[in-house]
Design a protein with these regions (language model features):
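Carbohydrate-binding surface patches
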Residues: 97-138, 144, 149, 186-192
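Acidic, Ser/Thr/Pro-rich beta/coil linker or hinge segments at domain junctions
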Residues: 137-183
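Short, small-residue-biased leader/transition segments that mark boundaries at the very start
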Residues: 1-6
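Short, hydrophobic/amphipathic alpha-helical packing segments
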Residues: 19-27
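Beta-strand-rich recognition/accessory modules
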Residues: 176-196
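The substrate-binding groove and active-site-proximal loops of carbohydrate-active enzymes
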Residues: 8-20
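Catalytic cores of secreted or luminal carbohydrate-active enzymes
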Residues: 27-44, 49-95, 190
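Generic recognition of flexible, low-complexity loop/linker segments
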Residues: 26-30, 39, 91-92, 101-106, ...
Length: 196
């Protein structure tokens, strides 16, 4: 009957690491174009095309796409900085000379922080990051977390709710006035810096 239609799970997609990287890239596009994009929302948050999944009388868990949303929501507030990115490139059916590295940065004068949201889209290679930040009064690295996995199709499920999660890392360091890191293939890196 009609009641059975409402009991079925509809559009309860399972998101993997690639979806996480895609959402991170889309959010970077919004941040990098914040002079035009004034607000961006996630329409479905729970169960239907979800960032969070649940089961009846059971647990809830965060999908892989939740985490780029989380970092952008908390730390993507302030003024977007225009980054000049020079990374290895690839070509596709629709574009040539596409950077493997996609990134955005937000400075929050009120909180005295600088946030970086960085994606390495290369399927094969780590990429060296080298941001020249000599004009910014950096005090220290507050936090850095990475999302990656050996299986690009790995996802969070009811049985493995923490398969794709951010992990603390220390791959980013300062050398003179540059922020450097070797970003693993197919990964999302969040870096939070304290500024004066």
């Amino acid at each position: 009957g009609l009641g059975d239609v409402y009991k079925r799970q509809i559009l309860q997609d399972q998101y993997n690491l690639l979806d996480c990287l895609l959402v991170g890239t889309v959010l970077n596009t919004f941040i990098n174009n914040s002079h035009v994009v004034k607000i961006a929302c996630m329409a479905q948050l729970v169960n239907v095309i979800p960032a969070i999944s649940t089961v009846k009388n059971g647990i809830s868990w965060r999908q892989s796409v939740y985490y780029p949303l989380y970092f952008a929501s908390l730390y993507g507030r302030g003024e977007s900085l225009q980054l000049k990115i020079n990374s290895p490139k690839y070509s596709s059916d629709i574009a040539d000379d596409v950077n493997y590295v996609d990134a955005s940065a937000v400075i929050n004068e009120e909180e005295k922080t600088l946030s970086f949201f960085i994606i390495n889209r290369s399927e094969d290679e780590s990429v060296d990051l080298d941001f020249d930040i000599n004009n910014l009064p950096i005090i220290k690295i507050i936090d850095q977390q990475i999302i990656n996995h050996t299986n690009i199709y790995a996802s969070n499920t009811i049985n493995k709710p923490n398969e794709i999660v951010p992990k603390k890392t220390n791959i980013a360091t300062f050398q003179k006035e540059n922020l450097i890191a070797k970003i693993p293939k197919l990964s999302y890196l969040f870096i939070l810096l304290k500024i004066k």
